[in-house]
């Protein structure tokens, strides 16, 4: 997801060269401050392979004039569209028997308060109450820690096939 934030920031002229991790995403979130997102058409697609595409959203951003008010509005619209896209994707991939299972939100994009708060609100309306990391940051380090924990649990439960794959 993070690269979508980087691309959006570049398309809006907020950060063309990133020297530090998350600079582009932070500028995008800052640009949206104080703006209410517009009601827009669906600007994402869930592809036949189950992946999420934000290309329609990127096309809209590419057409945004680079004046400060338009960039600020487009930034707010981006955050809203991403939250709605993720919610739609999660709800489509979650079957009725899985709605009560824990859903963990992990990755650096969940440091973005605007998008994360909106996503949690949308999922809550659907009866899904996701888990967010509080003991460790949700970025790459936290994701790696979670992966290591799951691998240790799978090994302990005998779900590893002796190699590096989890047995069904």
Q: Over which residues does each language-model region extend?
A:
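Glycine-rich beta-strand-to-loop/alpha-helix junction loops that act as flexible
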Residues: 1, 103-110
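Hydrophobic, well-ordered secondary-structure elements that form the walls
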Residues: 86, 105-108, 119, 145
């Amino acid at each position: 997801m993070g690269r979508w934030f980087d691309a959006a920031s570049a398309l809006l002229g907020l950060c063309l060269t990133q020297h530090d991790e998350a600079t582009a995403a932070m500028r995008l979130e800052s640009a949206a401050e104080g703006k209410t997102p517009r009601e827009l058409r669906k600007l994402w697609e869930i592809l036949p392979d189950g992946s999420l595409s934000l290309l329609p959203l990127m096309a809209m951003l590419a057409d945004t004039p680079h004046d400060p008010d338009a960039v600020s509005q487009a930034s707010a619209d981006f955050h809203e569209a991403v939250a709605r896209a993720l919610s739609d994707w999660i709800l489509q991939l979650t079957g009725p028997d899985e709605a009560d299972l824990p859903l963990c939100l992990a990755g650096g994009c969940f440091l973005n308060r605007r998008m994360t708060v909106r996503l949690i609100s949308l999922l809550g309306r659907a009866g899904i109450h996701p888990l967010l990391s509080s003991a460790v940051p949700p970025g790459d380090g936290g994701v790696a820690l979670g992966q290591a924990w799951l691998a240790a649990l799978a090994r302990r439960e005998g779900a590893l096939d002796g190699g590096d794959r989890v047995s069904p």
